[in-house]
């Protein structure tokens, strides 16, 4: 890591939702997934998002990831109203400020770990040397520099998720959004991935937002947001990261 000193949350919200609703369909088929969500995420925080299926957590994460927009309400990112942006502007914001990690890794099967990590930089237009240098540095951060030339089939599930995390951080995003990042891993590999995310959060200051169904994984977060019936039911703060593991 670039620094051995932990970077605490600033207390200032990098993300602020006020009265956010999301409605799908119309008439008899209309469904309100979010019913007025208020939520502040401090810069540098590690937040776990929990709740039963249909509670609104995935819809909220899609909005926070600029993959969807609210039907009503306000979404501020770094103080800027996101609901005023068009599709192309939201795509630019995603590329510049956000990194994504998925349950299923979403790696290209026929390309090396290095080439997978380079992809966001390729889309951004970086030259070949800059891409390689940055991708190797990201792989080194996740402990996989020596596996740079291996394809996903030659890597374990935990290693594949590390490659996916390297791909997510290679652009130095402000926020990392992780959707069930340990869902396809055994308990030992799950803890390793959570320790890696917690380390990135503490030492790099990256804000981590993670959806999980597992309390043991949520214990790595400083803040746990509980959703129920399209609303934030409660927010637990002041967690000691990894306390229950």
Residue locations for each model-derived region?
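ABC-family P-loop ATPase nucleotide-binding domain
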Residues: 1-23, 233-245
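ABC family nucleotide-binding domain
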Residues: 13-227
């Amino acid at each position: 890591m670039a620094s051995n000193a932990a970077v605490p949350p600033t207390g200032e919200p990098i993300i602020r939702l006020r009265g956010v609703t999301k409605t799908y369909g119309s008439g008899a088929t209309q469904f309100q997934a979010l019913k007025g969500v208020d939520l502040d995420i401090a810069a540098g925080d590690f937040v776990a998002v929990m709740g039963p299926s249909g509670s609104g957590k995935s819809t909220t994460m899609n909005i926070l990831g600029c993959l969807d927009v609210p039907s009503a309400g306000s979404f501020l990112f770094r103080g800027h109203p996101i609901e005023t942006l068009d599709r192309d502007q939201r795509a630019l914001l995603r590329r510049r400020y956000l990194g994504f990690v998925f349950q299923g890794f979403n790696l290209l099967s026929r390309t090396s770990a290095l080439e997978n990590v380079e992809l966001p930089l390729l889309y951004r237009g970086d030259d070949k040397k800059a891409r390689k240098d940055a991708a190797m540095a990201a792989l080194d951060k996740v402990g996989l520099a020596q596996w740079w030339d291996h394809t996903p089939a030659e890597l374990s599930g935990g290693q594949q998720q590390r490659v996916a995390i390297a791909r997510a951080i290679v652009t130095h995003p402000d926020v990392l959004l992780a959707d069930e990042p340990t869902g396809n891993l055994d308990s030992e590999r799950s803890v390793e991935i959570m320790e890696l995310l917690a380390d990135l959060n503490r030492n790099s200051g990256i804000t981590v937002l993670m959806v999980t169904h597992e309390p043991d994984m949520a214990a790595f977060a400083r803040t746990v947001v509980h959703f129920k019936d399209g609303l934030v039911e409660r927010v637990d703060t002041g967690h000691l990261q990894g306390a229950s593991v």
